[in-house]
From Swiss-Prot:
It is found in: Secreted. Keywords: Hydrolase, Secreted, Signal. Its EC number is 3.1.1.22. InterPro entries: OHBut_olig_hydro_put. It comes from the Bacteria. GO terms for molecular function: hydroxybutyrate-dimer hydrolase activity. The active site is at S322 (charge relay system). Pathway: Lipid metabolism; butanoate metabolism. This is D-(-)-3-hydroxybutyrate oligomer hydrolase. Belongs to the D-(-)-3-hydroxybutyrate oligomer hydrolase family. Its main location: secreted. Residues 1-22 form the signal peptide.
Length: 725
């Protein structure tokens, strides 16, 4: 294997491998922005099609299905699979249409393995029909898009809402699927979920949930607009998709002290958007009802006539993956007015309350730790995972060879991190090898399954833990970009790893090609306190004089969980605003997740949520499907050599979950019971695994074997979720 060549290939495509991170919403968000009781006042029987009060100016665009379309932006199934991104006539000044095409291309590929051997075009993808049959078609879907901001009147919120209505939408059998963005992405950040809806003639209700990939470039004071194009903050005014809330004097002082920095909406809006992700999902649904009726001509109907598409005649499924899946569950918990009928989500991020009284047992053995919120376990991983990935027991893990070859990282950085952890009293072993083994065992003890072991190296190589910890730390604490929380900032870097002006082409296209959570599109994490001046975090020398990937910053982030200073208290309060209740109000629901998930470990999300739901939802209809040999990032399967031999695509099970919930709501078909699905990896040679077949990815069943059943019991106020080995 040519490690330098392969690592360069990974870095070139890293901006397409968007992170899908966790998120949820507390009930404190209910009732704001015109949603009475998280339901709103646009009742099924209301005559006239009243635009929701939170919706601003609406733009409607037509996509003909030939040169452009809703699902592939005119690229077709083959274009989405192409390794070459769509061209832009003027790279530093892309048009809105060019950015939309780039966004759909990048977002789809970030979420889906588009390699034919991985199942694209045979098991899933635009050219596979609703019955799972491969076709020779392009998969393009004609229709219209309605897009608008949801705002609270300040121009600071400006959450993007988008509704796609296919021409095939059937008013006699109306359906709506939500597709809240995954990760910190923009509006098309769950396009792979939207695909299912469009194929089934449903409207798709998207929201960027107050995140997005377009930054505020503080050096030039330019900001993204709703369509991803850029202008000055002054010219944008209240139409900016995001502008950091700074005065001119604050900005000037910040630029003088810390030049060439960027602010991102998820991290720096100072609004803790995660607390409102469920609310924004409900707003997207309400906007969808209005948009559909508008397209159907409801404005011209006689007074007193019922609207064609209403809550009482429309199937609405809250869906998405990762952050978006957590948002869908949050919306279903908050929905007291009947906007949502069912839930089908993949790998959702779910923050459980500390008093959940839920325990998880695997193979009859109760696990010592489960049900932690995202920032808790990701800040823990941010300390130990880089060291743990060098354990001899996982030396064959994908990307581990890149560390050994010092490709993109300092030489010996893993051993340096292990030694620094020992110097700080966090490890006790004396040798680098023993320290790595100890760090890996710490991850196991904190909730990561052994099945995640081979994923730790790539999680570390792509800096996923520090990126999540820094962005969520800022967001939860409502930190300003001025605060440089834990002495981190965001900037492009020069050849010496010091901050420099961001590349003009990268900046112009970042709203489409970025993922909203640095490192992304050439924007790096910066250690402001590095020896020798601000330096790219993973390349920095910290206070101890070691190249240990900024352990000082990682320790600072971890300490926010228990600290008593203002930033720590703000973060702790922010987490409390994102906790789930577990009560889905009896809605039929399916959660699917891969057992190998190393980003959102099953023991901190789906498994304990099943127990929380059993305690709080007296009419529960929730089932949980745990898929063996599946992990969080399907986009990595063809990107990272070795993933293809080890992992099956979870997207297939996410679509099957939608099939099952839709059949339940449409025909009364029972949902499958909670179970483990035992898949078969493709095997073969890393980077050249044989083609997947249906035999590799069996469906879940209505009658799982006893050894595959996942059980839930409640006794003495404690729910126990029992998962087989």
């Amino acid at each position: 294997m040519n490690t330098t060549r392969d690592a360069n290939r990974l870095r070139q495509r890293a901006s397409l491998s968007g992170l899908a991170l966790a998120g949820s919403l507390g009930l404190a968000g209910c009732g704001v922005l015109g949603l009475a009781g998280c339901g709103g006042d646009n009742n099924s029987s209301t005559s006239g099609n009243v635009k929701p009060s939170f919706v601003g100016t609406v733009t409607v665009t037509r996509h003909d299905g030939a040169n452009d379309d809703l699902l592939t932006a005119g690229l077709g199934a083959a274009g989405l699979a192409s390794a070459s991104a769509p061209s832009v006539a003027t790279p530093t000044a892309p048009t809105a249409a060019e950015l939309r095409r780039l966004d759909i291309y990048a977002s789809y590929r970030a979420l889906v393995d588009t390699a034919a051997n991985g199942g694209y075009g045979t098991l899933y993808g635009p050219s596979v029909d609703v019955n799972g049959n491969a076709t020779s078609g392009s998969g393009m879907v004609p229709g219209v898009e309605y897009i608008a901001y949801s705002d609270d009147g300040t121009g600071q919120q400006n959450v993007v809402l988008l509704v796609q209505i296919p021409d095939a939408f059937d008013p006699a059998n109306p359906c709506i699927i939500t597709a809240t963005s995954s990760g910190s992405r923009g509006i098309y950040g769950a396009i792979s979920t939207g695909e299912w809806g469009l194929k089934h003639k449903c409207a798709v209700a998207y929201t960027d949930k107050g995140t997005g990939a377009g930054p505020h470039d503080l050096a030039t004071d330019t900001v993204p607009l709703q369509d991803g194009t850029r202008t000055t903050r002054l010219a944008a005014g209240r139409t900016a998709q995001f502008a950091a809330p700074l005065t001119d004097s604050q900005l000037a002082a910040f630029n003088a002290a810390t030049p060439n920095r960027l602010a991102f909406k998820h991290a720096h809006s100072q609004r803790n958007p995660e607390k409102d992700w469920g609310l924004f999902t409900l707003q997207a649904v309400q906007f969808a009802f209005w948009a559909i009726n508008d397209k159907l001509g409801a404005a011209g109907m006689p007074a007193g006539s019922p609207l064609p598409v209403r809550r009482d005649n429309t199937i609405v499924i809250a869906s998405s993956i990762s952050n978006g899946g957590g948002a869908a569950i949050a919306a279903a918990e908050q929905d007291t007015a009947g906007w949502i009928d069912g839930v089908a989500v993949g790998e959702p991020g779910l923050n459980l309350p500390p008093s959940a009284n839920v325990q998880v047992a695997r193979g009859g053995v109760t696990l010592p730790v489960s049900g932690k919120p995202l920032f808790d376990y990701v800040s823990y991983a941010n300390l130990f995972r880089l060291c743990a990935a060098s354990s001899s027991g996982v030396s064959a893990a994908p990307t581990q060879a890149f560390f050994a070859g010092a490709v993109g990282w300092p030489a010996s950085v893993q051993a340096n991190r292990c030694a620094a952890l020992r110097a700080n009293g966090l490890l006790s072993s004396a040798t680098a090898a023993a320290q790595a083994d100890e760090a890996l065992q710490k991850l196991h003890a904190f909730g990561w399954e052994p099945e995640s072991d081979l994923v730790h190296a790539s999680m570390s190589y792509f800096e996923i833990d520090p990126s999540v910890a820094v962005t969520f730390g800022n967001a939860l604490a409502r930190a300003s970009v001025l605060d440089n929380l834990c002495n981190f900032s965001f900037a492009a870097v020069d050849s010496a790893f010091h901050p420099t002006a961001v590349n003009a082409t990268s900046l112009a296209q970042m709203a489409a090609l970025g993922n909203g959570i640095p490192p992304t599109s050439g924007v790096q994490l910066i250690n402001n306190l590095a020896q020798g001046g601000p330096t790219q975090s993973k390349q920095s020398v910290d206070g101890s004089g070691a190249l240990a990937a900024n352990l000082d910053g990682a320790l600072c982030l971890r300490n926010l969980l228990t600290g008593g200073d203002a930033a720590s208290l703000a973060l702790q309060a922010g987490i409390a605003q994102t906790l789930r209740t577990g009560n889905l109000h009896g809605k039929p629901a399916l959660i699917v997740q891969g057992r190998n998930d190393a980003l959102l470990p099953v023991n901190h999300g789906a498994r304990p949520y099943l127990g929380l739901n059993a305690q709080t939802d007296s009419s529960s209809r929730l089932s949980y499907i745990e898929v063996m040999n599946a992990q969080h990032f399907d986009g990595f399967i063809d990107l990272v050599p070795g993933y293809d031999t080890l992992f099956v695509p979870l997207v297939l099970y996410e679509q099957r979950a939608l099939d099952a919930v839709f059949a339940n709501l449409k025909n009364g078909t029972p949902l499958p019971p909670s179970q483990v699905v035992r898949t078969t990896p493709r095997g073969g040679t890393a980077g050249a695994a044989p083609a997947i077949t249906a035999a590799n990815v069996p469906n879940f069943t209505m009658t799982p074997a006893a050894g595959d059943r996942i059980g839930v019991s409640v006794s003495g106020g404690v729910a126990t979720v029992s998962v087989p080995n």
